[in-house]
């Protein structure tokens, strides 16, 4: 029987009490035990940590939906990135200190447009930003992983991150899974899904790591160049191998 894993939405009562997602992660860890207890549970029950990545239009969202249906706990690095910018967080303060008070809007939130204008087309400034944001995301992801492991010490935790290798997070998992898609297939899918022209999609692909670069750093390669049914078969095979 597949165990249902609670997501953020299942903690609405905590949100109503004014607790942020970060607070909830700390609350879970505090209630369920110390770091030493979590480490003990890992050793006793062999929690499996998976890092999942892939390029543009590779099928990461479809893979995540599949893994959730199998009972995996999923951590979305992109969503954690939004938390980093939330008013009052450590990341919020660091970004403002680095890029100036003028990136703050009238609602005291960081104006992503103003921030983007400062880093777009400027590799040095972009690196300056990611050097702040990526470690903060990693910290939040570790909190979430520990929380889920304490709740379900015999389960599977998946960290989904498009920038897994760029950020240096591949060491957070027992296995790294990559979804590989041929560039021509990715372009067709992205154009149909996002309404972008081919040149725009090609530019985005060119800015990412290649399939070969990702595959060289991964433990499990899942190809997604065919039908959705074929993709599900590949995911099922990887899942079964993981749980042998």
Task: State the predicted function of each range.
Residues 79-156:
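ATP-dependent small-molecule kinase phosphotransfer cores
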Residues 45-72, 77-79:
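Walker A (P-loop) phosphate-binding motif
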Residues 33-46:
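Short, Lys/Arg-enriched N-terminal segments with co-localized hydrophobic residues
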Residues 141, 170-172, 188-241:
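Small-molecule kinase domains that catalyze NTP-dependent phosphoryl transfer to phosphate-bearing small molecules
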Residues 142-151, 157-192:
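ATP-dependent NMP and nucleoside kinases share a basic, alpha-helical "lid"
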């Amino acid at each position: 029987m597949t165990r249902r894993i609670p997501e953020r939405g299942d903690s609405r009562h905590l949100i109503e009490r004014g607790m942020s997602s970060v607070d909830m992660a700390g609350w879970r860890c505090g209630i369920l035990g110390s770091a030493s207890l979590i480490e003990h549970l890992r050793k006793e029950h062999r929690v499996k940590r998976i890092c999942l990545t892939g390029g543009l239009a590779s099928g990461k969202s479809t893979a995540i939906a599949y893994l959730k249906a199998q009972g995996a706990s999923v951590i979305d690095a992109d969503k954690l990135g939004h938390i980093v910018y939330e008013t009052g967080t450590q990341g919020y303060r660091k970004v403002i200190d680095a890029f100036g008070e003028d990136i703050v809007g009238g609602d005291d939130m960081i104006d992503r447009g103003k921030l983007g204008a400062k880093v777009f087309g400027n590799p040095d400034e972009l690196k300056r930003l990611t050097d702040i944001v990526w470690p903060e995301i990693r910290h939040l992801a570790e909190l979430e992983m520990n929380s889920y492991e304490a709740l379900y010490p015999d389960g599977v935790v998946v960290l989904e991150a498009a920038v897994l290798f760029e950020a240096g997070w591949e060491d957070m998992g027992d296995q790294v899974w990559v979804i590989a898609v041929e560039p021509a297939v990715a372009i067709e899918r992205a154009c149909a899904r996002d309404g972008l022209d081919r040149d725009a999609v090609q530019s985005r692909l060119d800015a990412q790591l290649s399939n070969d670069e990702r595959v060289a750093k991964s433990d499990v390669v899942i190809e997604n160049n065919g039908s959705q049914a074929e993709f599900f078969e590949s995911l099922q095979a990887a899942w079964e191998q993981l749980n042998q």
